Design a protein with these regions (language model features):
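Cofactor-pocket helix-loop regions in the catalytic cores of large enzyme subunits
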Residues: 77, 83, 155
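Beta1-alpha1 glycine-rich phosphate/pyrophosphate-binding loop at the start
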Residues: 2-7, 13-16, 42, 46-50, ...
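Core beta-strand elements of the Rossmann-like FAD/NAD(P) dinucleotide-binding domain
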Residues: 154-161
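Ferredoxin-type iron-sulfur electron-transfer modules and their immediate structural context
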Residues: 1-77, 132-135, 161-286, 300, ...
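Extended alpha-helical scaffolding regions
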Residues: 338-376
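Domain-exit/linker segments immediately C-terminal to small folded modules
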Residues: 298, 303-345
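Rossmann-fold NAD(P)-dependent oxidoreductase module
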Residues: 89, 93, 261, 296
Length: 376
């Protein structure tokens, strides 16, 4: 959202392509349920996320295509039956991993139900938009052979991996792909029901990661101007009817909703030297577990259970399963710490090795030195 707002369309599209190889299709016909979690819902209306991503695709396409190159091959070959969203997704991510990929599509054009139904019959998306996504995938070195109806698995001898993305009702020689040994079934055929384009993309990506035995994408974290983010709070701005929606509150970079909605002020944002963003801590003694923070959280979390919890007594800590800390020796800065279900101890400024990750140590150090009033 930030890059689109700043007019950096190429960079925005490159981030989208890390996890979504069909930006034109999803930017046009996805159900955009991401907008249900947008913090702007609590102000006036959600940010037009899908629209902004389509703008990135449309305006960043030529620049990305000019630089897109297939990676060095790994020596493996994969055949994918079906050029719908799941098959195209798997093809893209396998190709990114260096696999030589060929997609076989029985129809005369690729795109699956998006092309045959949503485009040709419903008119919800243009053939040109679908074609641009397919061109992106082909630019990664993927070959797509249309008019190829594969009826037997032995037709694909010589491939190291064979994936079937034939849809929920798709058959191979009268048999369900799931009943044919050696086939990796993805998409709606894997789910056993008609799903969404986004779910099919995700399944294709999961299949590629399982085959490659490694992640095929990375998370991109952009630094935010926190003062600019804070300055937008409380401003009621309706979404524009067209064009870029600039109202994003950048919850991916600065999210402190749980500190604002807690009626007991049991969640607190703490600036920690050396860390990019303020860190959320949970104050056990102030929480009555009303669940407000979970209801308003735009992420899939429950801050009153997930965030590092500051306990006042050993009994309170023993009665909880939260990750958390308890100051046991104020004079030496010694803490009892629970992380990932394991108990350990940590001393601020101590010389002994610690099992705690550096961000956790920095947070504990900051609390002890600058926010000691929350520790007892």
């Amino acid at each position: 959202m930030t890059l689109v707002r700043e007019g950096k369309y190429k960079e925005a599209l490159e981030i989208i392509l890390e996890k979504n190889p069909l930006p034109f299709i999803t930017g046009t016909i996805c159900y955009h349920t991401c907008m249900d979690s947008c913090t702007r819902n609590f102000y006036e209306s959600p940010v037009e996320i899908r629209r902004n991503k389509l703008i990135a695709a449309e305006k960043g396409y030529d620049a990305v295509m000019a630089e897109l190159m297939p990676p060095e091959g790994c020596g493996k070959k994969a055949a994918i039956i079906g050029a719908g969203p799941a098959g195209l997704s798997a093809a893209y991510f396998l190709a990114r991993g260096g696999v030589d990929v060929t997609v076989f599509e029985k129809n005369d054009v690729a795109g699956g139900i998006v092309r045959s139904f949503l485009c040709d019959k419903k008119g919800q998306i243009t053939a040109d938009a679908i074609g641009k996504d397919i061109s992106l995938i082909e630019k990664m070195g993927v070959r797509i052979e249309t008019g190829r109806d594969i009826s037997r698995a032995d037709e694909l001898a010589g491939f190291d991996y064979v994936l079937a993305a034939c849809g929920v009702k798709g058959l191979m020689g009268g048999a369900k792909p799931a009943d044919i040994p050696g086939l990796i079934v993805i998409g709606d055929g894997h789910y056993g029901k008609t799903t969404s384009v986004v779910e099919c993309i995700a399944d294709g990506k999961r299949a590629a990661e399982a085959i490659l035995n490694m992640p095929v994408s990375v998370d991109t974290e952009l630094a935010a101007d926190e003062e600019a983010v804070y300055s937008q709070r409380g401003q009621l701005i309706m979404a524009p009817e067209a064009g870029c929606d600039r109202r994003c509150l950048q919850c991916d970079a600065v999210c402190e909703v749980c500190t604002e909605v807690c009626p007991n002020r049991a969640n607190m944002a703490v600036p920690v030297p050396g860390l990019l963003h303020r860190q959320i801590i949970h104050l056990d003694a102030l929480c009555n577990e009303c669940g407000n923070c979970r209801s308003f959280c735009p992420w899939q979390g429950a801050p009153y259970k997930d965030k590092l919890t500051v306990f006042r007594t050993g009994a309170d800590m023993d009665d909880s399963t939260n990750p958390g800390i308890l100051l046991v020796q104020p004079e030496t800065g010694r803490f009892r710490v629970r992380m990932d279900g394991m108990m350990t101890e940590y001393t601020v400024g101590g010389s002994e090795p610690s099992l705690l990750e550096e961000p956790v140590r920095k947070l504990i150090d900051t609390l002890f030195k600058d926010y000691s009033y929350v520790l007892w």
